[in-house]
């Protein structure tokens, strides 16, 4: 102290036994800052849970429970105490609440020095279900893919192109088992929180407490605990949405991106990154394979696979030789000619009723939230718009509000024009809430669940609604694009698309690609059990090449035609 000229302070406590951001993530932040033209601090901040970010006002309490620790074998005063001690010996660190003996008995044993009741930290588990499941036998095609990827001992990107129901998840699970047996870890990503419960259930059933979950719907405490479990090397697998790509795993042996084509993998706020790009950087760092899986790969990924940049693996058939669903296009122009102005065509209404009568389930896709798309004044032709985003406000009947789907600005619904004061206004368009109401009014035996952002806002909302549908508490699932990917319900034999033209006509050069992906994915939800699946797609343009490719399940033809269009227009 005299030499340095200042006083040393005593270290009271070490805050973190291990740094929250390891050397790899710090190197990754440098790379991201350069690639995205962002500051390094913003890149580092997006890697941390919100509870650990500077200026965060949220506090997280550490959870404890009392457990019984066995110390030594000594003769006790009563047979009851001896019986309790023997039980405690067989159940190390038994929680007091789970002990079949009274607290009086335990306190007497503790006074004699045979046991000690201590406080132990416990982690909050976001998913409590504990269903154990063994590996399923792989088909020859699945086994070929697994063997091919396991032979890779260096960085390589694999594009796993498998039709819906071809068993890609089983490939992920068995690859993960082999990687864990080598003493390495696995990073598994899905594009949306909606898909997390099903993927978590699959991984938890095989690997139990070795799995951690990371996504934004976890509570502050759960997310904090899961992050600490990863930092402390207590887990071997991390399953999560886009942000899970920054999980502080060590010794990564495999990185998987399911539904790699999904737009949700792109971070729209600063720093703007592509999850696949970050995953490939981490794959290079750890010298491990990166698997990009999809039934409808992005054109960029498929093009790279054909050029040899990625390694292409294919699963062209469903497991157990199950046929793909038959798809029928319903021309809504013909429906109008026959004076049917309903939301559903006559054919689709008949098919829904037949499916319900057979005690089978239905899934209906309408990629539009709310009840009505907008409100128009019939006197002055004014449309009510968001003052911040300049887009029309959507009517939500359940909350009786007009809401902006970009910034969530909302005002109470008043049937009056804000511009001229006229009450001669009309709600135009249809959303999931309107379809839900229509089904309940027109099908007497319909038990409907609506599955969109609005119905799943609360914690565990996704899990609860999907569990109810899986348990057949409802027989119709109506939803937005959230129902299109990754869901596996064996009793669903009919899928209906209310309006295929919604995404086909948006002003985006990727409109064709996204429409094909959405329709092919949602079609794949049908017929995943023992019964043949059927799909009906309502459209005003049934001869469009995208819809014809969907009808024939022909990805190669779609790829060929769409690439020709992009090359002519000089699109990416």
What are these regions (language model features)?
Residues 258-272, 276-277, 470-475, 480-529, ...:
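Conserved RecA-like helicase motor core of SF1/SF2 enzymes
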Residues 281-282, 288-292, 298-378:
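Conserved interdomain linker/interface between the two RecA-like ATPase lobes of SF2 helicase motors
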Residues 212-220, 262-272, 335-341, 424-428, ...:
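Flexible beta-alpha connector loops of hexameric P-loop NTPases
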Residues 37, 281-286, 524-532, 570:
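Arginine/glycine-rich "motif VI" loop of SF2 helicases in the C-terminal RecA-like domain
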């Amino acid at each position: 102290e005299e030499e340095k000229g200042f006083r040393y302070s005593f270290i009271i406590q070490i805050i973190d036994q291990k740094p929250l951001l390891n050397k790899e993530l710090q190197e990754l932040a440098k790379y991201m800052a350069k690639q995205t033209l962002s500051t390094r601090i913003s890149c580092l901040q997006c890697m941390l849970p919100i509870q650990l970010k500077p200026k965060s006002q949220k506090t997280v309490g550490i959870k404890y429970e009392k457990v019984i620790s066995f110390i030594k074998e000594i003769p006790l005063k009563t047979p009851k105490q001896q019986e309790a001690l023997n039980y405690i010996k067989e159940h190390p660190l038994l929680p007091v609440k789970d002990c079949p003996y009274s607290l009086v008995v335990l306190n007497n044993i503790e006074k004699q020095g045979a046991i000690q009741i201590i406080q132990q930290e416990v982690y909050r588990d976001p998913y409590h279900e504990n269903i154990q499941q063994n590996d399923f036998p792989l088909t020859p095609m699945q086994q070929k893919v697994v063997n091919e990827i396991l032979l890779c001992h260096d960085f390589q990107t694999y594009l796993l192109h498998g039709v819906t129901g071809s068993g890609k998840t089983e490939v992920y699970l068995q690859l993960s088992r082999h990687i864990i047996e080598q003493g390495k870890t696995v990073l598994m990503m899905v594009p949306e929180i909606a898909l997390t419960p099903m993927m978590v259930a699959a991984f938890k059933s095989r690997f139990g407490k070795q799995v951690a979950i990371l996504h934004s719907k976890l509570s502050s405490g759960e997310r904090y605990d899961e992050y600490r479990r990863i930092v402390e090397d207590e887990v071997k697998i991390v399953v999560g949405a886009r942000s899970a790509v920054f999980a502080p795993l060590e010794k990564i042996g495999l990185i998987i991106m399911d539904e790699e084509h999904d737009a949700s993998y792109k971070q729209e706020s600063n720093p703007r990154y592509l999850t696949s790009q970050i995953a490939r950087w981490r794959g290079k760092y750890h010298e491990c394979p990166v698997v990009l899986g999809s039934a409808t790969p992005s054109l960029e990924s498929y093009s790279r696979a054909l050029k040899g940049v990625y390694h292409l693996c294919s699963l062209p058939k469903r497991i157990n030789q199950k046929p793909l669903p038959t798809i029928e296009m319903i021309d809504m122009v013909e429906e109008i000619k026959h004076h049917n102005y309903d939301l559903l065509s006559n054919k689709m209404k008949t098919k829904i009723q037949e499916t319900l009568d057979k005690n089978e389930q239905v899934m209906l896709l309408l990629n539009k939230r709310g009840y009505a798309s907008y409100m128009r004044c019939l006197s002055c032709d004014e449309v009510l718009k968001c003052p911040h985003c300049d887009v029309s406000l959507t009517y939500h009947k359940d909350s009786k509000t007009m809401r902006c789907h970009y910034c969530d600005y909302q005002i109470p619904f008043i049937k009056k024009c804000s511009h001229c004061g006229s009450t001669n206004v009309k709600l135009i368009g249809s959303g999931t809430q309107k379809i839900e109401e229509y089904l309940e009014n027109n099908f007497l035996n319909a038990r409907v669940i609506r599955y969109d952002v609005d119905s799943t806002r609360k914690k565990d909302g996704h899990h609860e609604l999907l569990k109810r549908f899986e348990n057949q508490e409802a027989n119709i699932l109506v939803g937005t694009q959230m129902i299109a990917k990754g869901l596996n319900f064996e009793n669903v034999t009919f899928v209906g698309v209310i309006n295929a033209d919604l995404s086909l006509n948006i002003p985006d050069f990727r409109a064709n690609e996204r429409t094909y992906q959405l329709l092919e994915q949602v079609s794949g939800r049908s017929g995943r059990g023992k019964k043949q699946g059927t799909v009906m797609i309502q459209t005003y343009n049934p001869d469009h090449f995208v819809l014809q490719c969907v009808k024939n399940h022909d990805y190669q033809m779609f790829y060929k035609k769409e690439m020709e269009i992009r090359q002519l227009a000089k699109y990416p």
